[in-house]
């Protein structure tokens, strides 16, 4: 029997079978995906084969080939990865310039990982109703930056409804992963997009100005227009996984394009003479924040924080 994984609670997976049944499934202890050492070998969005047992539950026996997936390192020094979701048409990264602040480093690491696994990303700048003049000016500068690179950007307020209709249109006929820090308003936005869903939300911690985790597991919801949303737990940091040092620049489109003009084919864009990328940063054709994010990923790689999957 075949089906779609629509919910993952850690030890159990909820599968919607092709004939419409909802079946609670487990995986066998030795289940591994070839080439991936992951804390969750099965992810929401996976197409699977299941074997029913007498209790009405089932085992997942096989995963169909994935179109793509989004993966992050489980923790800073971990050799294992965590797959956020699989078989995506797009990601929507929900960010805020305050309450709490989403750093450009976090944004860039997420974008680089999505580039590596061929998942298009749209950036949703939420809480535009809450910002002062300086914050709105900074937000506009970020929108200019990421739009020029090629990432569609949207200004929204999940609270007031500003921009929500435009996002609703973008969901039609697509499987969309929603991701971002805790507290950026992801669950509030999903509730605004799909009335009646009532995904649990929480207030921002006033003491730390950080969000509190409300979604504790990944889950897929249908949306009007034959689309699906995958809601994931808020994440503090985004450790990219399974990237070789020489590949990292490939996942920054503007750095990759400019690197064709570097003197050396294996230029890492740090100290090498004749580096077109460094020159472009100095002349403000490449954003300094993007270049800083690129360097931080190289530095982490050198410190051994990025490990090849096996």
Curated annotation (Swiss-Prot):
Cysteines engaged in disulfide bonds, as pairs: none
GO molecular function: GTP binding; GTPase activity; metal ion binding; rRNA binding
Stretches that traverse the bilayer: none
Domain CP-type G, residue spans: 77-238
Main localization of the protein described in the UniProt heading: cytoplasm
CDD domains, sorted: S1_YloQ_GTPase, YjeQ_EngC
Enzyme nomenclature, EC number: 3.6.1.-
PROSITE patterns to which the protein is assigned, alphabetical: ENGC_GTPASE (PS50936), G_CP (PS51721)
Residues that bind GTP: 126-129, 180-188
Keyword Thylakoid part of the UniProt annotation: no
Positions annotated to bind Zn(2+): 262, 267, 269, 275
Keywords (A to Z) from UniProt: Cytoplasm, GTP-binding, Hydrolase, Metal-binding, Nucleotide-binding, Ribosome biogenesis, RNA-binding, rRNA-binding, Zinc
One GO location term (cellular component): cytoplasm
Pfam families tied to this protein: RsgA_GTPase, RsgA_N
Name of the top EC class for this enzyme: hydrolase
Localization terms from the record: Cytoplasm
Details of cofactor binding: Binds 1 zinc ion per subunit.
Coiled coil regions in record: none
Keyword GTP-binding: yes
Cofactor(s) the protein requires to work: Zn(2+)
One BP term from GO: ribosomal small subunit biogenesis
PANTHER family xref list: SMALL RIBOSOMAL SUBUNIT BIOGENESIS GTPASE RSGA (PTHR32120), SMALL RIBOSOMAL SUBUNIT BIOGENESIS GTPASE RSGA 1, MITOCHONDRIAL-RELATED (PTHR32120:SF11)
Subunit structure: Monomer. Associates with 30S ribosomal subunit, binds 16S rRNA.
Functional note: One of several proteins that assist in the late maturation steps of the functional core of the 30S ribosomal subunit. Helps release RbfA from mature subunits. May play a role in the assembly of ribosomal proteins into the subunit. Circularly permuted GTPase that catalyzes slow GTP hydrolysis, GTPase activity is stimulated by the 30S ribosomal subunit.
Record-given protein name: Small ribosomal subunit biogenesis GTPase RsgA
Organism, as annotated: Bacteroides fragilis (strain ATCC 25285 / DSM 2151 / CCUG 4856 / JCM 11019 / LMG 10263 / NCTC 9343 / Onslow / VPI 2553 / EN-2)
Taxonomic lineage from the root: Bacteria, Pseudomonadati, Bacteroidota, Bacteroidia, Bacteroidales
Chain's gene name: rsgA
């Amino acid at each position: 029997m075949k089906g779609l994984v629509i919910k993952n609670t850690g030890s159990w997976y909820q599968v919607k079978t092709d004939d419409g049944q909802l079946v609670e499934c487990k995986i066998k202890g030795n289940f591994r995906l070839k080439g991936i050492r992951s804390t969750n070998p099965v992810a929401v969005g996976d197409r699977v084969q299941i074997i029913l047992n007498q209790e009405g539950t089932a085992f997942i026996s096989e995963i169909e080939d994935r179109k793509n997936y989004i993966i992050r390192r489980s923790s800073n020094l971990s050799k294992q990865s965590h797959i956020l979701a699989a078989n995506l048409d797009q990601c929507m990264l929900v960010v805020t310039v305050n309450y709490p602040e989403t750093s450009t480093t976090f944004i860039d690491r997420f974008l680089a990982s999505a580039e590596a696994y061929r998942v298009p990303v749209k950036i949703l700048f939420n809480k535009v109703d809450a910002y002062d003049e300086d914050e709105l000016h900074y937000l506009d500068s970020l929108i200019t930056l990421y739009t020029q690179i090629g990432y569609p950007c949207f200004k929204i307020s999940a609270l007031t409804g500003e921009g929500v209709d435009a996002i609703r249109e973008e969901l039609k006929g697509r499987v969309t992963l929603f991701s971002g820090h805790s507290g950026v308003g992801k669950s509030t936005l999903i509730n605004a997009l799909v009335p009646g869903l009532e995904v649990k939300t929480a207030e921002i911690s006033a003491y730390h100005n950080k969000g509190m985790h409300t979604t504790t597991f990944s889950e897929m919801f249908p949306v009007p227009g034959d689309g699906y949303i995958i809601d994931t737990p808020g994440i503090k940091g985004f450790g990219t996984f399974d990237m070789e040092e020489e590949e990292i620049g490939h996942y920054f489109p503007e750095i990759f394009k400019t690197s064709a003009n570097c003197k050396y084919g294996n230029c890492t864009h740090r100290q090498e003479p004749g580096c077109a990328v460094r020159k472009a940063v100095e002349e403000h054709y490449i954003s300094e924040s993007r270049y800083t994010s690129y360097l931080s990923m190289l530095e982490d790689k050198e410190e051994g924080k990025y490990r090849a999957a096996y």
